[in-house]
UniProtKB/Swiss-Prot annotation:
Keywords: Amphibian defense peptide, Antibiotic, Antimicrobial, Cleavage on pair of basic residues, Disulfide bond, Secreted, Signal. GO terms for cellular component: extracellular region. Belongs to the frog skin active peptide (FSAP) family. Brevinin subfamily. Expressed by the skin glands. It comes from Odorrana versabilis (Chinese bamboo leaf odorous frog). It comes from the Eukaryota. This is Brevinin-1Vb. Residues 23-44 form a propeptide. One of its GO terms (biological process) is defense response to Gram-negative bacterium.
């Protein structure tokens, strides 16, 4: 049981170190993006999947209501 706890603690600490390194790298990338075009691309990447997901949910319902073939 003790070896299992040691292994889990080791994985936890390695994971937190990995996450902190990734966060620092992401922050460095965000600092480099100063141009408005690159910011707009980031916003488009965030919202396009959201819009596509909503459309995928509502299009069958709208089609069913229009054609009345449910």
């Amino acid at each position: 049981m003790f070896t299992l706890k040691k292994s889990l603690l080791l994985l936890f600490f390695l994971g937190t170190i990995n996450l902190s390194l990734c966060e620092e790298e992401r922050n460095a990338e965000e600092e480099r993006r100063d141009e408005p075009d690159e910011m707009n691309v980031e916003v488009e990447k965030r919202f396009l999947p959201l819009i596509a997901g909503l459309a995928a949910n509502f299009l069958p319902k709208i089609f069913c209501a229009i054609t009345k073939k449910c």
